[in-house]
Design a protein with these regions (language model features):
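Phosphodiester-processing cores and adjacent nucleic acid-binding clamps
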Residues: 1-203
Length: 203
């Protein structure tokens, strides 16, 4: 509701490691859009009439475009934990978590693949947290948009420890897998690391 009031017409739900809130989020958005969808249906019916003048058609098309702009779009996603090794590795301290990676479904195929990845993270990769890995990311990447995520992301972590070669390799790997659907995040949130963003950008 707050997003809509501030002029935004879309929002993504990206809970960490799960999609438990997706159904409630989608259903609520569908309910909020119901009146607007009824208006769109009525406007399309009016446009289908054969006795309209060109001015009337233009006015109806304008109203239709404005109504379609009011539709709120729910973006279904997840902030996944990507294992530093294999999702099957469950022995070392570093296996207890994973790099953060934001995944968004851009179509039905992407939604199905996202559900598959999250499920595999719980069924096969769970070790303190549900983890996926590069192998299944590559296998189920179709229809997904990927973002490098927060300070816990793979690229940031490698930049932070000064391993720019490994960071570049990570960028190239994600670019190879997701193509134009891979994005690197830049954030302006306060951290306890002075000039962290500037140092990263300079390099």
């Amino acid at each position: 509701d707050k997003a809509a009031k501030t002029g935004m017409n879309a929002i993504a739900l990206t809970d960490h490691g799960n999609m438990f809130g997706v159904k409630e989020f989608f259903n609520y958005t569908k309910k909020k859009n119901s009146k607007t969808k009824d208006q769109i249906k009525a406007l399309k019916a009016e446009l289908g009439k054969t006795d309209l003048t060109e001015d009337q058609k233009a006015e109806l098309r304008q109203q239709l475009a404005e109504a379609e702009q009011r539709l709120f779009k729910p973006i279904l996603g997840c902030e996944a934990y990507v294992s530093r090794n294999s999702r099957h590795s469950k022995t070392n301290q570093e296996d207890r978590s994973g790099y953060h990676l934001v995944l968004l479904a851009k179509n039905k195929t992407g939604y199905r693949n996202l559900c598959k990845l999250v499920s595999l993270g719980w069924m096969e990769g769970f070790y303190y947290r549900p983890r996926i890995d590069h192998d299944i990311l590559k296998q189920y990447s179709e229809g997904l948009i990927a973002s490098s995520a927060c300070l816990g992301g793979e690229i940031h972590k490698k930049v932070e420890r000064g391993d720019l070669v490994a960071a570049e390799e990570a960028v190239l790997w994600y670019k190879e897998v997701f193509g134009d659907d891979f994005y690197i995040e830049l954030q302006r949130h306060k951290t306890d690391k002075p000039n962290a963003d500037y140092e990263c950008l300079d390099k």
